[in-house]
């Protein structure tokens, strides 16, 4: 038996998220159908986590087990021949049988991209969120520092989030401006449902002068969603960039 690890890139616009669900097409479902067609049998595919409807990925990690003696390149190319144009396998490699893409993940890097422009951009509308008006970028950067470290992120999760614990560790959070584009790069141990999108909404309110760095600090002191954290920004600006592992997959 072999454990095959895939690095997957996808445009999440047309999908109801990553995970298979009864009502709506998902990325995992499409990949499992392609796997079944290639291998001639139904094969479960386990991902490193979930992305919500409309969210994209450059570095989703998933694994499947097979006894097929195919070269690694054949797995990648075979799947890409069967997948639609908005999903692609970027890499395929063999990892130890005990490796699990979710449970062995050490950290994840998400990026949220905002277009700071009064004019809409038809070519980028599916991968950025356009925001009119000016932002105080320096104030937003100061607020980013408050998120770094281990905190209770109860105030930064969706109301239907079912996570057993709301404590997470943020390793780094940076704002990078490239012309009209503003990227929020967040690297953390894990994320609650809608957490990055709510953090982004909170930072925007800091940039608009509606919240202060002190307000952010108070929200991180074990608050809940009713404590007026920021809005949940739209999904299209969010992208899973990379999942990090230690020795089991390096």
Swiss-Prot record:
Kindly give the Pfam families that the UniProt entry links to this protein: PseudoU_synth_1
Q: Which residues bind substrate?
A: 110
Source superkingdom: Bacteria
Biological process according to GO: tRNA pseudouridine synthesis
The EC number of this protein is 5.4.99.12
Q: Which reaction does it catalyse?
A: uridine(38/39/40) in tRNA = pseudouridine(38/39/40) in tRNA
Q: Which UniProt keywords apply?
A: Isomerase, tRNA processing
Q: Please give one Gene Ontology molecular function term for this protein.
A: tRNA pseudouridine(38-40) synthase activity
Where's the active site on this chain?
52
Role played: Formation of pseudouridine at positions 38, 39 and 40 in the anticodon stem and loop of transfer RNAs.
> Entry's HAMAP family?
TruA (MF_00171)
Q: Which family does it belong to?
A: Belongs to the tRNA pseudouridine synthase TruA family.
Q: Subunit structure, per the record?
A: Homodimer.
What this protein is called in its record is tRNA pseudouridine synthase A
Q: Which organism is it from?
A: Citrifermentans bemidjiense (strain ATCC BAA-1014 / DSM 16622 / JCM 12645 / Bem) (Geobacter bemidjiensis)
Gene this chain is encoded by:
truA
């Amino acid at each position: 038996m072999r454990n095959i690890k895939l690095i997957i890139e996808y445009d999440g616009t047309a999908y109801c998220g990553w995970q298979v669900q009864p009502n709506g097409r998902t990325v995992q479902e499409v990949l499992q159908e392609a796997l079944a067609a290639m291998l001639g049998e139904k094969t479960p595919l386990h991902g490193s986590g979930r992305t919500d409807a409309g969210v994209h990925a450059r570095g989703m990690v998933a694994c499947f087990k097979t006894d097929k003696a195919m070269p690694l390149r054949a797995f990648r190319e075979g799947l890409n021949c069967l997948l639609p144009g908005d999903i692609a396998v970027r890499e395929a490699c063999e990892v130890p049988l005990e490796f699990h893409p979710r449970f062995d993940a050490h950290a994840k890097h998400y990026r949220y991209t905002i277009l700071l422009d009064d004019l809409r951009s038809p070519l980028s509308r599916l991968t950025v969120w356009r925001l009119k008006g000016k932002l105080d970028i320096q104030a937003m950067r100061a607020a980013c520092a408050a998120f770094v470290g281990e905190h209770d992120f109860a105030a930064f999760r969706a109301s239907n989030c079912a996570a057993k614990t709301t404590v997470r560790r943020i390793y780094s959070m940076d704002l990078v401006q490239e012309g009209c584009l503003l990227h929020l790069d967040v690297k953390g141990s894990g994320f609650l449902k809608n957490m990055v999108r709510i953090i982004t909404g909170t930072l925007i309110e800091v940039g608009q002068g509606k919240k202060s760095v002190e307000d952010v600090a108070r929200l991180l002191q074990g608050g809940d969603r009713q404590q007026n954290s920021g809005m949940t920004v739209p999904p299209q600006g969010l992208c899973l960039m990379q999942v990090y592992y230690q020795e089991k997959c390096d």
